[in-house]
Amino acid sequence: MRFPELEELKNRRTLKWTRFPEDVLPLWVAESDFGTCPQLKEAMADAVEREVFGYPPDATGLNDALTGFYERRYGFGPNPESVFAIPDVVRGLKLAIEHFTKPGSAIIVPLPAYPPFIELPKVTGRQAIYIDAHEYDLKEIEKAFADGAGSLLFCNPHNPLGTVFSEEYIRELTDIAAKYDARIIVDEIHAPLVYEGTHVVAAGVSENAANTCITITATSKAWNTAGLKCAQIFFSNEADVKAWKNLSDITRDGVSILGLIAAETVYNEGEEFLDESIQILKDNRDFAAAELEKLGVKVYAPDSTYLMWLDFAGTKIEEAPSKILREEGKVMLNDGAAFGGFTTCARLNFACSRETLEEGLRRIASVL
């Protein structure tokens, strides 16, 4: 794995490296510092050389690539004909709510949540029913469905807690959803980054799961391709496929042709890079968790993702940890308040070199 020097990372000029002053070390937004997958760089260079800048073609190669990757990694792959390219995961979630749930029905949102999950009910004109993501209590979910909720936003693996859900749990969850004719809208963007065991594809666990789940994923986190604008949505029953095909192109369009090439490439050729990334991230996770616990921070060590949820309650910075760490320690973590009002919490991104991680932890320790 190649780790770019700090100046190289700054020269990327991405959001992570431009939002805050240069003396602030960014360990916040879900963007990796790793060098790019070599096969991906080659594919992008080839596309630029061939001047592939026009309208994107049908994504048939991507469909097969995603299905093959899912089958190899998870033991279940969708029908390639049920896979469709979309600009990004959040667009897919919004479309799923608007076109595949009961009109006007409430949305179950487990908290803490990836901030766009909290915004989605607002922008789709729906009521939100909040539940505790630490518990993901099935009785609480069933009550919400019984009270009229039409869908659950199911981030599996979970962001920011890093929870990986079992087949048994998903089976029970989707059975409950089927009972109330509700939908499970599944965000699997972090699925490639499971540390122990195997990710369970929710749509593949049962017939009820196939009928209730709408699945959205992308290569954005595992291969750092967020700026290339190509996610994937796939369906696991014919009725949903038909409904999707009936949507206007205006509703679905916006995929980047370079994003299509990138996603197809890494699904087909990027597993060696992925495996190497996972080992580095696992080591970083264990190191960061041990060091932060020594400082009195409550650590939720993730089973997946390179994002670590931290609770600073009981420390001297509990009132505004992200703000204080940025101002006094010159290190930036995501503010827990944005994830549903968790004001004593923050989210740390450890997808970086050990040197960078050690420096970030040193800055945190200097404040605590």
UniProtKB/Swiss-Prot annotation:
GO biological process: methionine biosynthetic process
Pathway membership, UniProt: Amino-acid biosynthesis; L-methionine biosynthesis via de novo pathway; L-homocysteine from L-cystathionine: step 1/1
Cited InterPro entries: Aminotransferase_I/II_large (IPR004839), Class-II_PLP-Dep_Aminotrans (IPR051798), PyrdxlP-dep_Trfase (IPR015424), PyrdxlP-dep_Trfase_major (IPR015421), PyrdxlP-dep_Trfase_small (IPR015422)
Keyword tRNA-binding: no
Molecular-function GO terms, alphabetical: cysteine-S-conjugate beta-lyase activity; pyridoxal phosphate binding
Signal peptide (UniProt feature, chain positions): none
Gene3D superfamilies noted in UniProt: Aspartate Aminotransferase, domain 1, Type I PLP-dependent aspartate aminotransferase-like (Major domain)
Reactions listed under catalytic activity: L,L-cystathionine + H2O = L-homocysteine + pyruvate + NH4(+); an S-substituted L-cysteine + H2O = a thiol + pyruvate + NH4(+)
EC number: 4.4.1.13
Observed effect of gene inactivation: Cells lacking this gene show methionine prototrophy, suggesting that additional methionine biosynthetic pathway can be present in C.glutamicum. The mutant strains also completely lose their ability to show resistance to the S-(beta-aminoethyl)-cysteine, which is a toxic lysine analog.
Keywords linked to the UniProt accession: Amino-acid biosynthesis, Lyase, Methionine biosynthesis, Pyridoxal phosphate
Source organism superkingdom: Bacteria
Function of the molecule: Catalyzes the transformation of cystathionine to homocysteine.
Listed name of the protein: Cystathionine beta-lyase
Organism listed in the record: Corynebacterium glutamicum (Brevibacterium saccharolyticum)
Gene: metC
